[in-house]
Amino acid sequence: MSRFFANGSDSESESSEEEVQAPNFNKATAFQFSDDEEEVKRVVRSTKEKRYENLTAIIKSIRNHKKIRDISNTLTSFEDLTKAYQKALPVISKEENGITPRFYIRCLAELEDFINEVWEDRDGRKNLSKNNAKSLGTLRQKVRKYIKDFEDDLSRFRENPQEESENEDEEAAAHDSDGGLDAGSDIEKREPTVAATKLAKSVPSKLPVADDEDSDESIDWDPDTESETESSEDENQYQNMRERFLKRSTEKDDKDDDKRKDKRKEQKIKLRKRAEDEDGEGWETVVKGHVVEKPKMFEKDAEIDIPLVLAKLLEIMSARGKKRTDRRLQIDLLFELRDISDQHELGVPISVKIHFNIISAIFDYNQKISEPMKLEHWALLLEVMQSMMKLLLANPDIQLSESVAEEHEEYNATPYLIRGCPLAAVERLDDEFTKLLKECDPHSNDYVSRLKDEINVVKTIELVLQYFEVNGSNNERCRIYLRKVEHLYYKFDPEVFKKKRGDIPNTTQTSVDIMDRLCKFIYAKDDTDRIRTRAILTHIYHHAMHDNWFQARDLILMSHLQDNIDAADPSTRILYNRMMANLGLCAFRQENVKDAHHCLVDLMVTGKAKELLAQGLLPQRQHERSAEQEKIEKQRQMPFHMHINLELLECVYLVSAMLLEIPYIAAHEFDARRRMISKTFYQQLRSSERQSLVGPPESMREHVVAAAKAMRCGNWQACANFIVNKKMNTKVWDLFYESDRVRDMLVKFIKEESLRTYLFTYSNVYTSISIPSLAEMYELPVQKVHSIISKMIINEELMASLDDPSETVVMHRSEPSRLQALAMQFVDKVTNLVDVNEKVFDMKQGNFFQRGNMGNRGDRGYNRNQNNQGGNWGGQRRDNRNQRNRNQRGHHKNQQNQNQQQQQQHQREQQQVQTIDEE
């Protein structure tokens, strides 16, 4: 054996030779290969090393992107990570028995926490760039979808995330043969060559490289079990001979290492449990950070009485609002003080005082008024509020009022006087309940859970209402009555209709009766316009919801709200818009189509019904709002359970417009001065007519437009089928109470208006038409057809007369035929075209011929005798133009006279219709 290999050996038989050759050891380690061998420096790595190194590199880049909040690049790196993990799956299933590496689970958990943190930071989200904001939503969806396959691994990781650091210590003790992954650190790959070089420099050659537990184990270097290819790969893997002959772990060693790790872990757990069992009573878990010692309430031998408790209460509440006050500790101290007071039986007044201070402390816990309070504090607030009001109602001699000064409080003799305002507390509680509802997703179970709390909120309001009916002033009673009304006005009560039908006794109290009692008290006693205005609006809304059309209409007309609503605050204007929308629905249900259209036209013509009803913000107008305005508008939004169905509202508006607009269009088809009743419906109809190919209707608007086209032809059956069908019933009509009655009313109106449209359209075709045939065609009673035609004749809409013996309608040829009307329109347009052409010609000629000297060209040889001729020709054209202007002015006066006559005739028609209705 050569001396070089002898230096690299570690056997005992050659130990003396190693000692002799010790001075030459450095030369052997510094031995270099030839130039050809130095050029090729390949490191042969296994597939596991390659895949894991790729994963760790991507994970490191993700962490760097998270530090600088680069969401866009984080999304890109996450996509690369999923692809790399997909490639590494075969290695994981083979090497790790299908168990996902812990460092990968850790990366997913950290990424999920990072996304949730950024998503909950709303102010920070607004400051993100457009690209990062868009990438955040995409990344959140992809991560939530991706981690569903790792839920069990993530849950185990979150239960014991510190296990990874223990693995790190164990792996540091036992060298990893693959160059290993440090699971506790940033999961960076260790290079075997670097580790071996450091070990060669730091450890003497005569000492073994392995740890103490492995020192007695020998490595089997059997040349017969290794192929030539493996030896060649080993030779190419290392740069010098010392690295080649350093000890490396085999598969057997890896298994032994795993066993030793498990044994160490079990021993640590046993020792920890044993220590906890032995010394658990004398030890406490130390919380990280500064620990605030809970102050003692009273001295051990102190005599607990009312002055001492009040002094302690004042001491606790004096820290209210200060910067370093622990608000949670303050609430806990107040509860402890209440318990001490109850234990020593200091009386109900002191308990009420502590209750009210607990309520104030809970309200103070949330510093930002715009954000909702925590659910634990909300449940606590409801409990304490109801407990305080029950104490007040059970003890009438206790007066809790804000008019009592603190120095005049009385706890020893009746009447007990305590400073506080339960009305302000219940108003704040009601506002917090609304904020909680707005914060929840309306389509989630959380919203339903929070909505169940409304029962407790209403009970609390009832308790406060009972207290102030005995002890409160008129102003305070009006305020608490309004809170009660605002929780009642939008709720539908079927008992009202049962009472109308006589199914229940008349003595039964319904929500309408409660609203009448509360609102009438506010009308009589309130001295502020806002409370009275809101009470009127809620009263009208409730009447309209229960089909009390005439009461609601009379109330709004007598109050003159529409005249001064523009001066009201935004929340009151929102309530006014909601009232008008519900009033329009009520008018539609009560067959008052024209009134329904008038109520809804102001809301729907703007195209911003969603914003006007405070049911959401339109994304199209986002650029028009600043961040502060958007925040304010979101605070004004109505809770989801109070929303009005916008599709129902739009459908009622379009159907009402169709029933009014289509007969009017048929009656004034050739009228150039025809006005539009509904601009929105007219635009929908015109846009549909401009389309070359129109498919079957799908949306609600398309159904209404298709029904309008059928009505223009007088086809009532097709019109009714488009309005009343399975799809429209599901979307719209089934949302009404007594929907069958509404559908029957719709079909009846469609028949009547289709009959009117048919007579307007085809009156110039008939000389006479039979009334029974019209009744059979439109499936209406003969008396109804006779009544409709009579009204049309009286209103001078139809030029005809009724022949009662023969039951026919005789048409009068007073109106021009279709061909004549088109010819008249053509003549008017040609006349206008001629006038326009003459004006254009005059503008092009200018004033050349009006100058007497023909442009003053006498010096160029023109005859001066021609000046008069040119001047006369220009004067003639001027006379013609003046005459034409006079004719136009005369024509304009004639048109004005005709318009005045038509207006007078229209007024006479309205008077006649009113007299007929009165009869």
UniProtKB/Swiss-Prot annotation:
Q: Name one GO molecular function term.
A: RNA binding
Q: Where is the composition biased (Basic residues)?
A: 883-894
- Regions of biased composition (Basic and acidic residues) lie at 241-269
Question: In which domain of life is the source organism classified?
Answer: Eukaryota
Species the sequence originates in = Drosophila willistoni
| UniProt record, GO biological process | formation of cytoplasmic translation initiation complex
Query: Record's InterPro entries?
Result: EIF3C, EIF3C_N_dom, PCI_dom, WH_DNA-bd_sf
One of this protein's Pfam families, by short name? PCI
Q: What is the lineage of its organism?
A: Eukaryota, Metazoa, Ecdysozoa, Arthropoda, Hexapoda
Which Gene Ontology terms of cellular component type are present?
eukaryotic 43S preinitiation complex; eukaryotic 48S preinitiation complex; eukaryotic translation initiation factor 3 complex
What residues bear Phosphoserine in this entry?
A: 34, 165, 177
The chain positions of domain PCI read 640-816
UniProt similarity note: Belongs to the eIF-3 subunit C family.
Compartments, record wording: Cytoplasm
Here the segments flagged for biased composition (Low complexity) are 895-919
Q: Sum up the protein's function in the record's words.
A: Component of the eukaryotic translation initiation factor 3 (eIF-3) complex, which is involved in protein synthesis of a specialized repertoire of mRNAs and, together with other initiation factors, stimulates binding of mRNA and methionyl-tRNAi to the 40S ribosome. The eIF-3 complex specifically targets and initiates translation of a subset of mRNAs involved in cell proliferation.
Annotated keywords: Cytoplasm, Initiation factor, Phosphoprotein, Protein biosynthesis
**UniProt feature, compositional bias: Acidic residues:** 11-20, 162-171, 210-236
Question: Which residue ranges does the record annotate as region Disordered?
Answer: 1-28, 154-275, 848-919
Q: What is this protein called?
A: Eukaryotic translation initiation factor 3 subunit C
Assembly and binders? Component of the eukaryotic translation initiation factor 3 (eIF-3) complex. The eIF-3 complex interacts with pix.
